[in-house]
Amino acid sequence: MIKNYLSHFLPVLLALDLIIPFLLAPFYKDYNHLTQVMSVLGNSKAPLHSIYNIWLVAFGVAILISTLQLYPTVAQVSSSISIMLFSVIVIYAVGGCILSGIFSVGETKSLETLSAKIHGYGSVIGFLLLTLAPLFVGLYFFKVSNGLLGILSLICFIFAIVFFALFVMADKPNYRGTIIAFEGLWQRLSLL
């Protein structure tokens, strides 16, 4: 029952994951969507950090539940694609959402505390693997003979890789003052 209910609201939850930072940011003085990652809204100095951290955990749990429904559907077509897609989504839900919500990061990306290290490594691994999801979705669509959605998924995969690469490059000193330095923008675009 809850799985069927959740599948109807998953698109809303995915949209909220991008919208909630825009709703919370006005309460955090000097927060910049273009240059700062969303996790900064969960650090202890952010006025509404508890709301953001609770959201991340709830969102991660919702993704896990919906993935349990997705797995058998994809497995009917290909068990290997299903396992790979399930794995990357679960790792993102746990590392990029649940652990990131439980273990806050500081205002900067320095990994000085155990909490910041767990958050940093969990979210990097989660986001990195999430970039592979459109590839597996594309393979699934090709298997079910839906070439158009397969091609669109592969295009999304290419964009995800490009945006993730820009996200990783954004904090490097060589790119300071350039469009590549828009770390927050690249993070958000990699999630689309």
What do these predicted regions represent?
Residues I2-Y31, V37, L41, K45-L192:
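Hydrophobic, aromatic-enriched alpha-helical segments typical of multi-pass transmembrane helices
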